A protein has these predicted regions:
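N-proximal low-complexity "stem/linker" segments adjacent to membrane-targeting elements
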Residues: 1-24
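Short, acidic, metal-binding catalytic loop of nucleotide-sugar glycosyltransferases
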Residues: 23-32
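Glycine-rich, basic loop-to-helix element that forms the pyrophosphate-binding segment
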Residues: 55-73
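Short aromatic/hydrophobic "clamp" motif used to bind/position activated sugar donors
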Residues: 78
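Conserved donor NDP-sugar-binding/catalytic core segment of glycosyltransferases
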Residues: 90-121
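A recurrent flexible, glycine/aromatic-enriched loop bordering the glycosyltransferase active site
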Residues: 115, 132-150, 172, 202
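A short, conserved alpha-helix in the catalytic core of glycosyltransferases
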Residues: 142-150, 154-159, 164-192
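Non-catalytic, C-terminal membrane-associated alpha-helical segments of glycosyltransferases
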Residues: 209, 226-289
Length: 289
């Protein structure tokens, strides 16, 4: 049977949801799972027997926390699950394994995300422009990271999640690097995961990190000729969105993030091939916006 290395990242603030997430993985059939719960600044407690734990002394951020869990698990396929997500189908991982087996060109898969209470899923959960029909599968150019399936060799080839990002846009970085290895990132609209609709701006550092990491995305991954267009287009779009009265603080935080990203170069600059930029354009989102 296919073995999945499963990494569940948590800060320990949602014990009921965490247990539901773990249990939903434990109920998967026709696959083997090796599970680790990574406590990001928290010592995991009350974890089911047979599930590994890793306690990080401090909160090192979402992407770095996920990376820390990878060496703890075996499996040729990795599965990253948020602590407030849940698998409603006991064949979720089996279906993912079959998709990867039948489509060797696919390196990463994001499932369709459903709010279990019936709230309308936001368009940002569909990793392509013109979200439209959320049930339609196809190539992914961005990523909702809360239930990510990826081949281990592809993950390692990408250098893992960009740990220094801490929060925001780490999924785009990973998706770009999947494409740059010659693989396809895929949205499986027929395979579902449950996750509540949550306002991303609840994080106090949201706007600063959005801006800083946009700059770092460009500096890490884009050819020098198009990097300024990517940063410029997103800056213009964001400033228009934040132009309404009452957003003065948010605009200031965004500009602070831009300055931070420009002043502090990220690690591991690996400009994507021009052929990758073309593939992303053919998939619906050229890396200039």
């Amino acid at each position: 049977m296919t073995q999945f290395g499963v990494v569940v990242l948590t800060m320990g603030s949602r014990p009921l949801e965490l247990r539901a997430a773990i249990d939903s993985v434990g109920k998967q059939v026709n696959v083997d799972t090796d599970i680790v719960v990574v406590g990001n600044g928290w010592v995991p407690t009350d974890i089911p027997t047979g599930v590994k734990t890793l306690a990080l002394r401090e909160n090192i951020g979402i992407p770095a926390g996920r990376n820390a869990g990878v060496p703890e698990v075996d499996g040729e396929i990795l599965f990253f699950l948020d602590d407030d997500a849940e698998l409603p189908d006991p064949r979720f991982l089996e279906r993912m394994a079959k998709l990867l087996s039948s489509r060797p060109e696919i390196g990463l898969i994001q499932p369709r995300v459903i709010d279990p209470t019936g709230k309308h899923a936001p368009g940002r959960w569909v990793p392509r422009p013109r979200a439209g029909d959320h049930a339609r599968s196809g190539p992914a150019t961005t990523l909702w990271e809360g239930a990510t399936v990826i081949r281990r060799n592809v993950f390692e080839g990408a250098g893992g999640w960009p740990g220094e990002f801490f929060y925001a846009h780490e999924g785009i970085d990973l998706v770009w690097r999947v494409w740059d290895q010659g693989y396809v990132a895929w949205y499986a609209g027929d395979i579902e995961v449950n996750h509540p609709v949550i306002n991303p701006t609840r994080h106090s550092e949201f706007h600063r990190m959005q801006a800083r990491n946009r700059v770092w995305l460009a500096r890490r991954n884009l050819p020098a000729a198009i990097a300024p267009f990517y940063v410029g287009s997103w800056t213009a779009l964001t400033m228009v969105k934040l132009a309404k009265p009452g957003n003065t603080e948010a605009r200031g935080a965004y500009l602070d993030g831009l300055r931070e990203g420009m002043a502090n170069p990220p690690s591991d600059r690996t400009p994507m091939k021009w052929s990758t930029a073309w593939q992303l354009a053919r998939a619906g989102r050229p890396p200039i916006y």
